[in-house]
Amino acid sequence: MNIDYVRSILPHRYPFLLVDGVIEESEDRIVAFKNISISDPVFQGHFPEYPIYPGVLIIEGLAQTAGILLLKDLEGIPLFLGIDEARFKKEVRPGDKLIYEVKKIGEKLGTVQVEGVAKVENTIVAKAKLLLGVKKK
């Protein structure tokens, strides 16, 4: 599923839409991707001589991927409520294709906990547990 599908679900827009497409999706799991381009404005400052995609944006990409999973059956604004066990394993550079794998691991009192893993060429570059909610419009 391409960017049109992503835009039909998420409220985010360029330059803060950090998911380019969805590879597969089920009720409790989703795999999405982001192509990392040197033309991304973030590389003007992070870091011009040796561009590295910021870890915080990788985590946001995982959260947006989780948002697609949550919002496909709901309407509202996705809320990023918390993060645990975040780890960054390897740098991400322009030309890389980030793969976001997110699965639901729990639901309680209107919140959903997910486990997210970001990979480049099947190597884990980051992972975290995220807590999300949906604010009704």
From Swiss-Prot:
Q: Could you give one GO CC term from the UniProt record?
A: membrane
Q: What is its EC number?
A: 4.2.1.59
Q: Which residues form the active site?
A: H46
Q: Name one GO molecular function term.
A: (3R)-hydroxyacyl-[acyl-carrier-protein] dehydratase activity
Q: Among its keywords, does the record have NAD?
A: no
What does the record list as GO biological process? fatty acid biosynthetic process; lipid A biosynthetic process
- Any single Pfam family the record assigns to this protein: FabA
Location within or outside the cell:
Cytoplasm
Highest taxon listed in the record's lineage:
Bacteria
Q: Which reaction does it catalyse?
A: a (3R)-hydroxyacyl-[ACP] = a (2E)-enoyl-[ACP] + H2O
**Chain's role:** Involved in unsaturated fatty acids biosynthesis. Catalyzes the dehydration of short chain beta-hydroxyacyl-ACPs and long chain saturated and unsaturated beta-hydroxyacyl-ACPs.
Q: Which NCBIfam families match?
A: fabZ (TIGR01750), PRK00006.1 (NF000582)
* Family per similarity comment: Belongs to the thioester dehydratase family. FabZ subfamily.
Q: Kindly provide the name given to this protein in its UniProt entry.
A: 3-hydroxyacyl-[acyl-carrier-protein] dehydratase FabZ
Instruction: State the species of origin.
Output: Thermotoga neapolitana (strain ATCC 49049 / DSM 4359 / NBRC 107923 / NS-E)
Organism lineage reads as: Bacteria, Thermotogati, Thermotogota, Thermotogae, Thermotogales
